[in-house]
């Protein structure tokens, strides 16, 4: 009887410690969550968001403090986390440093009227290739986070990340109005996917033609790597017939490879609240 009770107590203690550790790891994103909850606004019937960069600039210290928290995470600490914690961390890092890139250049002498994140690049390099991010023991670029740590690591194989990372442009999937966290990551990624695919200004089926975002052209390979047994872009799309408003006939055509796929122009205008 005593031994049984002791085992129950030990199991309860382990669960409590595990829960506390999980909450502590997710709590690092609290300040980011607070910042974007207050300064990211849903538009376009909830399909998109607009960012009040000017307001965030007024609270720049809060943003930089959060970035310092991310910088303090060591590679060994990161490696010890479960995959959802890692991926939530990397998505938040990408989004927060993108906002930092915009805010630090907003209304500056060099960019008094910033129109697009692409204005922050040059003829020789893009803004995404700039190495300005101290993360996991190295100075990295936004490209490093997305293409090496997330896509290139082989750890995650989840194409839905393309609807979570935000490039500060109108054509991008919405910057989510809350931080990504391990415990909610699956639901958050799923909601972001539906949110983007159901936006008829960026993805729409008419007759035998499916017009979709250029994201699917640039990163098409990511949708052909077996995520949830989908090995083609069409198979991935068929996971979301309701979001895409596909008729039964269109679903059959897509399944049989009979739908024409058209990639829409991308809007690189800054996703700023006006």
Model-predicted segments: where are they?
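Cleavable N-terminal signal peptides
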Residues: 11-12, 22
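Bacterial N-terminal signal peptides that target proteins for export
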Residues: 1-10
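Interaction/scaffold regions that mediate signaling and macromolecular assembly across diverse proteins
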Residues: 26-80, 84-89, 98-274
């Amino acid at each position: 009887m005593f031994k049984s009770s002791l085992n129950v107590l030990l199991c309860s203690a382990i669960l409590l410690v595990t829960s506390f550790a999980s909450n502590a790891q997710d709590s690092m994103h609290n300040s980011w969550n607070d910042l974007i909850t207050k300064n990211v606004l849903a538009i376009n019937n909830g399909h998109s968001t607009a960012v009040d960069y000017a307001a965030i600039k007024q609270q720049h210290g809060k943003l930089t403090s959060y970035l310092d928290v991310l910088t303090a995470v060591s590679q060994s600490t990161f490696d010890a986390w479960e995959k959802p914690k890692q991926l939530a961390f990397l998505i938040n890092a990408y989004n927060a440093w993108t906002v930092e890139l915009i805010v630090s250049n907003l209304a500056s002498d060099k960019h008094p009227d910033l129109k697009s994140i692409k204005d922050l690049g040059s003829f020789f390099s893009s803004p995404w290739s700039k190495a300005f991010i101290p993360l996991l023991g190295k100075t990295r670029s936004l490209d490093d986070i997305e293409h090496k740590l997330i896509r290139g690591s082989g750890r995650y194989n989840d194409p839905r990340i393309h609807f979570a990372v935000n490039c500060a442009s109108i054509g991008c999937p919405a910057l989510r109005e809350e931080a990504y966290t391990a415990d909610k990551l699956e639901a958050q990624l799923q909601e972001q996917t539906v949110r983007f695919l159901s936006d008829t200004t960026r993805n729409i089926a008419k007759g035998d033609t499916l017009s979709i975002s250029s994201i699917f052209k640039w990163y098409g390979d990511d949708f052909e790597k077996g995520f949830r047994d989908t090995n083609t872009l069409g198979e991935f799309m068929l996971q979301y017939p309701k979001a895409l408003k596909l008729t039964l006939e269109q679903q059959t055509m897509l399944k049989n490879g009979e739908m024409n796929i058209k990639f829409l122009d991308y809007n690189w205008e800054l996703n700023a609240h006006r």
